[in-house]
């Protein structure tokens, strides 16, 4: 590679013809950390930990499938002529918003089946979701994907980035914006924010909705820097969805406060049967 810059090896473990990539290791680590955090949060909320484990068992495969379906829908011009590629998820092509949609739908159905409050469940897992996303973006870093537009080494050095990040952003002779890093840091800040505001006088469900608003706001601007956006005509799909989610979440907060009077988050004790609020 030009300039003598070598990218990091995306393969973590090589055993004969079997290779385990850093992307998979990082995503798996993110899931484990998210699970441990959610279990800890469930314990504080007096929630049965098995509920979190059971939800995860359903949410992981459904989220992967929905992330793939979401990606295929907006890349249909390619997949309609390559139908066999649809199931080849190992070739790449999943979308985080698709995964989140699948996870939320799973949680809604799961909470109804278990007769528990979706909002209580969503509040418990919200910090776990955003920290998992922060960690997961480093899988994109190892694959040299989800980057932004062309830039210069001088610009990256001006950000005071470690050398290994600058070198990894040198792809095919060109330096690119590390949008993976921008989103990862934004999510870390969001995680800290959620830990702070959960101690304030927010209502049940608003921790999760705050997560949606925070993530969507950052994603809207970061998506505008990326070069691999899924498109819907002339619009970036993730930007459109981000705006819709922000409006929907703010609307839900206002509506629930005016019409449903949900309990305060810190006072909303978990119960087996969800109350109508």
Curated annotation (Swiss-Prot):
Role this protein plays: Catalyzes the transfer of the diacylglyceryl group from phosphatidylglycerol to the sulfhydryl group of the N-terminal cysteine of a prolipoprotein, the first step in the formation of mature lipoproteins.
| Pathway membership | Protein modification; lipoprotein biosynthesis (diacylglyceryl transfer)
Please name the GO terms of the biological process aspect recorded for this protein, alphabetically. Answer: lipoprotein biosynthetic process
**One example GO MF annotation:** phosphatidylglycerol-prolipoprotein diacylglyceryl transferase activity
Compartments where found? Cell membrane
Specify the protein name: Phosphatidylglycerol--prolipoprotein diacylglyceryl transferase
| Pfam families registered for this protein in UniProt | LGT (PF01790)
């Amino acid at each position: 590679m030009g300039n003598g810059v070598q990218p990091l090896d995306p393969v973590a473990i090589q055993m004969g013809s079997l290779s385990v990539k850093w992307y998979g290791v990082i995503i798996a680590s993110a899931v484990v950390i998210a699970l441990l955090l959610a279990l800890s949060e469930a314990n504080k909320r007096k929630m049965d930990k098995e509920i979190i484990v059971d939800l995860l068992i359903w949410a992981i495969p459904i989220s992967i499938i929905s992330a793939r379906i979401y990606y295929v829908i907006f890349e249909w011009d390619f997949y309609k002529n390559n139908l066999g590629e649809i199931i080849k998820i190992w070739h790449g092509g999943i979308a985080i918003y698709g995964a989140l949609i699948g996870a939320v739908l799973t949680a809604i159905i799961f909470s109804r089946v278990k007769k528990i409050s979706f909002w209580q469940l969503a509040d418990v897992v919200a910090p776990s979701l955003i920290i998992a996303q922060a960690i997961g973006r480093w899988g994109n870093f190892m694959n040299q994907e989800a980057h932004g537009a062309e830039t210069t080494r001088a610009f990256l050095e001006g950000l005071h980035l470690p050398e290994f990040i600058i070198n990894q952003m040198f792809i095919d002779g060109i330096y690119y914006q590390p949008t993976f890093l921008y989103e990862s840091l934004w999510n870390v800040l969001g995680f800290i924010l959620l830990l702070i505001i959960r101690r304030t006088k927010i209502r049940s469900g608003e921790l999760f909705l705050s997560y949606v608003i925070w993530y969507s706001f950052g994603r809207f601007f970061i998506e505008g820097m990326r070069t691999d956006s899924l498109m819907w005509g002339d619009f970036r799909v993730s930007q459109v969805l981000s705006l819709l989610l922000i409006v929907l979440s703010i609307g839900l907060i206002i509506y629930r406060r005016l019409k449903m009077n949900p309990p305060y988050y810190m006072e909303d004790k978990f119960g087996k049967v969800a109350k109508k609020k």
